[in-house]
UniProtKB/Swiss-Prot annotation:
Span of the annotated motif 'Ionic lock' involved in activated form stabilization: 116-118
Organism expressing this protein natively: Lacunicambarus ludovicianus (Painted devil crayfish)
Membrane topology: Multi-pass membrane protein
Pfam assignment, any one: 7tm_1
The protein's name: Rhodopsin
Signal peptide boundaries: none
Annotated function: Photoreceptor required for image-forming vision at low light intensity. Can use both retinal and 3-dehydroretinal as visual pigment. Light-induced isomerization of 11-cis to all-trans retinal triggers a conformational change that activates signaling via G-proteins. Signaling via GNAQ probably mediates the activation of phospholipase C.
Chief location: membrane
Family: Belongs to the G-protein coupled receptor 1 family. Opsin subfamily.
Subunit record text: Homodimer. Interacts with GNAQ.
Keyword Nuclease recorded: no
Disulphide bond pairs: C92-C169
Maturation and modification: Contains one covalently linked retinal chromophore.
Phylogenetic placement of the source organism: Eukaryota, Metazoa, Ecdysozoa, Arthropoda, Crustacea
Amino acid sequence: LHMIHLHWYQYPPMNPMMYPLLLVFMLITGILCLAGNFVTIWVFMNTKSLRTPANLLVVNLAMSDFLMMFTMFPPMMITCYYHTWTLGATFCEVYAFLGNLCGCASIWTMVFITFDRYNVIVKGVAGEPLSTKKASLWILTVWVLSFTWCVAPFFGWNRYVPEGNLTGCGTDYLSEDILSRSYLYIYSTWVYFLPLAITIYCYVFIIKAVAAHEKGMRDQAKKMGIKSLRNEEAQKTSAECRLAKIAMTTVALWFIAWTPYLLINWVGMFARSYLSPVYTIWGYVFAKANAVYNPIVYAIS
């Protein structure tokens, strides 16, 4: 109880119907996430043709999402059943740490996947091919930096506390001291604004490069006196259209997944009067759903 901010005491308990709904949602999300990411890991690791350096990043993404749901799914089911956090202060901190760690690792793995695609498509033969050693170094960098940022609250730079809905734990965005807020400013930049900017930048140039390539092929086809260098079926879905869809899907899903949690943190810092316990649910609902569709977007594309 000592970890719960006074702000939450002004609100009545949430509608009891919210907990069964949240429990069912988490049950479905947990099963889909664990199954989808396990299948992704198993297929990529057991299919020789798929064991490429680039796919090591996809496997790492699936691993981080799998670990996030594996460690957070059971506690959430328990707290939804009891309508409050019942697992103690220490486990609250561990729970929040693991969620932040896996979330941060997932985000930056997606960034490196995007950067690899940028390197292959935009730079082409001029770009340095991704080797197993380099991919492994990227993965190690992701986990070391994620761990460094997420362990900081244990040493006094911000802290992990129960969320307003009391079914989960996260960073403390209600404390007004400059030390706590400075962590959230930098962490928001590190796990949201910078990755989003890099992703958008890379995909803009990827689409431009593919569009230029397609135009070159059409011009070459005209010189050769044929309609297209592609067969009729491939022409129906041009490369730039498919890639544009992947790019828009990636950026849109990123925005949908992480923006609610960011907004909750920033509203908590600057306009807490608008923040009720019910609103805090949506942050991790969308973030957890991200772990479900990641294997679909990245493994297939």
